[in-house]
Amino acid sequence: MRREDILVEEVQDITLDDLRGSSLLEVYNKIYGFSAESIYRGSRILKRIVSECDLRFISFTANLVSTGLRGLFADMIRRGYFNMVVTTGGTIDHDIARSFGGKYYKGSFEFSDEELRKINVHRLGNILIPFEDYGGMVENAVNRILPPLVKEKREWSVYELLWEFGKRIEDKHSILRAAYETNTPIIVPGVVDGSFGTNLFIQSQFTGLRINLFEDMRLIKDRVFSSKMAGALLIGGGISKHHTIWWNQFRDGLDYAVYLTTAQEFDGSLSGARPREAISWNKIRENAEQAVIYADATLALPILATSLIS
């Protein structure tokens, strides 16, 4: 390491005028220190994913779909920024519930959960969900939409079934609707883990429905193997993160990766693992452009998204 190689670009002080006249991302680049640099660098990589990659993954966890970010996810899909979605079963629950009239409310982390249970209100962080606006909404939607589909054919892949549900949704903020409109596959490897999957199972007892998860695997396999450049925005951890990077090992790894997370790597968890660990598994290429942003997605994702529309 030589001083002249690393002491190249100085940190810049910012002023109130900068906050009024510059883009927030450019302000972060001037600040540079600590998390500001990772958000700026992540935004630059995200722009390259959208402009250069023919395969563009976004993976995220269901809790975010209970917030106002749901509409942002739908809009990014509708505008074609991403053409492959990997998520969890709860995403489908929240999207269906809210699409068919379910109301989610602003609350507090500090509310008494014992008292909320007495008045039939779920708490998801500081989001409040009346009992009747969640499980019942999903159950009614499945009971109404699924039987005619099973009469057409008994065996369905998950992504095709979700397109059919999206086709019957009129809410412009719906992720399922946006995916249907753009033929964007939504891959849900843990589809049975939630209200939607449970109701599919119940309906299968009466309708003969069969879910073919291997067809979803075939689709993601074909997309990965045929891609020339692949990038991913991975928000949160768990099965959606792992399924995304897992399949990309078969093309020698992602070319671009942006992790947005609050998980830490000290416990050896998949959720906390950084991109450098994925390199050892061949899931991200050694020369890939990558960034880790340690932040709550409700704070950082809207800022990152501005880089796509600026």
UniProtKB/Swiss-Prot annotation:
GO MF annotation: an example: deoxyhypusine synthase activity
Active-site residues (renumbered): 283 (nucleophile)
Keyword line: Hypusine biosynthesis, NAD, Transferase
Pathway as given in its UniProt record: Protein modification; eIF5A hypusination
E.C. code: 2.5.1.46
Keyword tRNA processing: no
Cofactor field: NAD(+)
Catalytic activity from the UniProt record: [eIF5A protein]-L-lysine + spermidine = [eIF5A protein]-deoxyhypusine + propane-1,3-diamine
InterPro entries assigned to the protein according to its UniProt record, in alphabetical order: Deoxyhypus_synthase_arc, Deoxyhypusine_synthase, Deoxyhypusine_synthase_sf, DHS-like_NAD/FAD-binding_dom
GO cellular component, one term: cytoplasm
Coiled-coil features, chain-numbered ranges: none
Similarity comment: family membership: Belongs to the deoxyhypusine synthase family.
Function noted in UniProt: Catalyzes the NAD-dependent oxidative cleavage of spermidine and the subsequent transfer of the butylamine moiety of spermidine to the epsilon-amino group of a specific lysine residue of the eIF-5A precursor protein to form the intermediate deoxyhypusine residue.
Descriptive protein name: Probable deoxyhypusine synthase
Organism: Metallosphaera sedula (strain ATCC 51363 / DSM 5348 / JCM 9185 / NBRC 15509 / TH2)
Gene coding for it: dys
